[in-house]
Amino acid sequence: MKKILSLCMVILTSFSLCACSSEERKETNNQTKTEEKIYGVGETTTYKKDGQERVHFTVNSVSNTSDRNEFADSQPEQVIIIHYSYENIASEEDVYFSSVNFKVIDEGGNVCETYPASINTYPQMAPAGTKSEGEEAYGLKQQSSKIKLVVDLDYFGNKVTYELPIQ
């Protein structure tokens, strides 16, 4: 009799544990992920703080360049120039974007480095109510027709992603 009672207790415990675990799975499956918006050339992203628009950022173009630096240590497969612009709408601090804010990824999934190519437009500090633009050159490790650009808007984890064709 004790054996039957013990066996029944084990079976009931097993069923109750199975029921609990399937409920947890349902809760996990019901959670939805927020999909990150991917931006393209010419699309402006807005950085907000405390519900107020602070900065607008736009990638204007990504182009190939045949410019090579004979003194560069790296020999990339392809060199590109990213042309971008930004506007300080209402940030109390001056706004400045440069390669420090960017992570460039080629089609092979390689994180790429800046390259010492000639650029024509240098970014400037932008006080509230002003705009600036800039260019950054990157050496791609793999020949690519497009890149992914991750832009760090404020150094506190507010990032946006661009997928950009190379012209």
Which residue ranges define each predicted feature?
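C-terminal motif of bacterial Sec signal peptides marking the signal peptidase cleavage site
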Residues: F15-A19
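Repetitive helical segments and hydrophobic/amphipathic motifs
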Residues: I11-L12
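Positively charged n-region of N-terminal signal peptides that target proteins for export
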Residues: M1-I4
